């Protein structure tokens, strides 16, 4: 498990491009036959990528990072399958996950195992946050008929699919879902916002050979990162998080912090960006 210690806003302004990437970009999450995890001191979130092949991959214990006897002893986890159909076993029960399905597993589950499907490559992205009480394991299929938001004239027409949230799958603090775009739209979260009470992690995927220019940093001192397919971004509470793609893409978003109110954000006017 790789550990990430987040720079302050003042330090972030002075970082060279490679230092910025090292601090806020995760680029190695998906490797065949491996389960890869990254731990950030931002709200103590863990991001993981799982690519099972012939052998199932169990959720590992990392006592150095969590200080517990097993991974979910004091944590919860949200999982989204971004590949072909597969399954996740929780305590011996199998949960089939189709493409873009979500599974939530609550605090206290000792055995979580990721499995490949019979056709194609299943790939799982997960986020884990600390938890103080137990909520039941819950599965959600990919949402159908989600109403789009945004304006085609501003290239930001998109559908927000919410899975783990106050009015959906219940959790202690984790909020999770994914966003996809209408044809011709490529801007996400513009005008941007911050939310000083929560950390957010993005995973950009289904880019193909295209890229996303991800904007981050304080609103009056913005920076950018070039992001490729299946790369993740760590977004501190003080940072904006927005982006524009050179083609179609999707992104998973996950948050942890003081509340689960989706609308709790501090809007930033485009005119105020620098």
Curated annotation (Swiss-Prot):
> Which Cys-Cys disulfides exist here?
none
Question: What does the UniProt keyword field contain?
Answer: Isomerase, Metal-binding, Zinc
Annotated residues for binding of Zn(2+) = 193, 195, 200, 241
Entry annotated with the keyword Zinc: yes
Its annotated pathway reads: Glycan metabolism; pectin degradation; 2-dehydro-3-deoxy-D-gluconate from pectin: step 4/5
Citing just one GO molecular function, the answer is: zinc ion binding
Pfam families (UniProt xref): KduI
Name the reaction it catalyses.
Answer: 5-dehydro-4-deoxy-D-glucuronate = 3-deoxy-D-glycero-2,5-hexodiulosonate
Its EC number is: 5.3.1.17
As cofactor, the record names: Zn(2+)
Q: How is the cofactor bound?
A: Binds 1 zinc ion per subunit.
Single Gene Ontology BP annotation = pectin catabolic process
Protein purpose = Catalyzes the isomerization of 5-dehydro-4-deoxy-D-glucuronate to 3-deoxy-D-glycero-2,5-hexodiulosonate.
State the similarity comment: Belongs to the KduI family.
Would you tell me the protein name for this molecule?
4-deoxy-L-threo-5-hexosulose-uronate ketol-isomerase
Task: Please name the gene that encodes this protein.
Answer: kduI
């Amino acid at each position: 498990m790789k550990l990430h210690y987040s720079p302050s806003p003042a330090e972030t302004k002075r970082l060279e491009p490679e230092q910025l990437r090292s601090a806020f970009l995760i680029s190695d999450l998906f490797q065949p036959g491996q389960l890869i995890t990254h731990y950030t001191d931002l709200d103590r979130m863990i991001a993981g990528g799982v690519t099972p092949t012939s052998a199932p991959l169990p959720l590992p214990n990392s006592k150095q990072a969590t200080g517990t006897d097993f991974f979910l002893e004091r944590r919860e986890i949200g999982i989204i399958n971004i590949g072909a159909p597969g399954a996740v076993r929780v305590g011996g029960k199998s949960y089939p996950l189709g493409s873009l399905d979500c599974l939530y597993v609550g605090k206290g589950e000792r055995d979580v195992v990721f499995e490949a499907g019979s056709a194609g490559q299943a790939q799982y992205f997960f986020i884990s946050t600390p938890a103080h009480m137990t909520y039941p394991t819950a599965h959600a299929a990919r949402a159908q008929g989600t109403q789009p938001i945004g304006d085609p004239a501003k290239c930001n027409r998109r559908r927000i699919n919410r899975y783990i949230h106050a009015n959906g799958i219940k959790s202690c603090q984790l909020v999770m879902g994914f966003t996809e775009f209408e044809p011709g739209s490529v801007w996400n979260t513009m005008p941007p916002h911050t939310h000083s009470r929560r950390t957010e992690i993005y995973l950009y995927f289904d880019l193909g050979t295209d890229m996303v220019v991800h904007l981050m940093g304080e609103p009056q001192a913005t920076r950018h990162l070039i992001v490729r397919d299946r790369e993740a971004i760590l977004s501190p509470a003080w940072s904006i998080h927005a982006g524009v793609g050179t083609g179609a893409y999707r992104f998973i978003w996950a948050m942890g912090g003081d509340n689960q109110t989706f609308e709790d954000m501090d809007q930033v006017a485009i005119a105020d960006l620098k």
